[in-house]
Amino acid sequence: VGMRFDDRVTGRLDKYAKQAKLIHLDIDPAEIDKNVKSTVPVWGDCKETLPMLTALVDEKKHTDWLNTFYGYSKQEKEIVIDQELHPASGEITMGEVVEALNELTNGNAIIVTDVGQHQMVACRYAKFNESKSNITSGGLGTMGFALPAAIGAKFGAPHREVVAIIGDGGFQMTLQELGTIMQAQVAVKMLILNNRFLGMVRQWQQLFHDKRYSFV
């Protein structure tokens, strides 16, 4: 419903959900069949089309299917989460940093993330006690977003603590906003996670482009 089937969701398109029948609902006709061929394309506002579609199908429990995903979540904890939060190498991970931030803020801060690997980790592990507390550039993926957005968040909610989590690459793109912070005396905290690369771009080049690294 309303998705672009971009590579952050699908991974390699030539291997994505080959066994699945896809019903794709989207208000923009240009998105339908653009990246993935749909079995049933539905063009229109999902506020109208989704109720019309669900009225035609019977409710199912999908117990076995859901249990399979519960099993995958256990694997994710063992293979990904435990290694990020309790690494054996001794080198601090981004997950550990975000967990430490949770302890300091008690989930009460507004967390603004830039775009990159740190964004994925922050959105996975950051804890929030209130709504409207997680600000990120999720759709457009604009590097350099966090610092100016954090300034705006502090002006919008001056009574709340605002923390910007930024990668070393994204920080270089709008670091001139430090001048704005000093001029306007904006109390924004910055947490810079340096992975020494444009990490997510490099990761995609590693996974999908035979490690042909360029401009990372």
Give, region by region, the residue ranges found by the protein language model.
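Active-site glycine- and acidic-residue-rich loops that bind
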Residues: 4, 90-95, 170-173
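Glycine-rich, acidic loop regions that bind phosphate or pyrophosphate groups
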Residues: 1-69
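Generic enzyme active-site microenvironment
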Residues: 24, 112, 165-166
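Short glycine-rich anion-binding loops that position phosphate/pyrophosphate groups of nucleotides
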Residues: 2-6, 116-118, 169, 195-196
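Thiamine diphosphate
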Residues: 16, 32-43, 47-53, 121-216
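Active-site diphosphate/adenylate-binding microenvironment
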Residues: 73-154
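A short acidic, amphipathic alpha-helical/loop segment
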Residues: 9-13, 100, 177-180
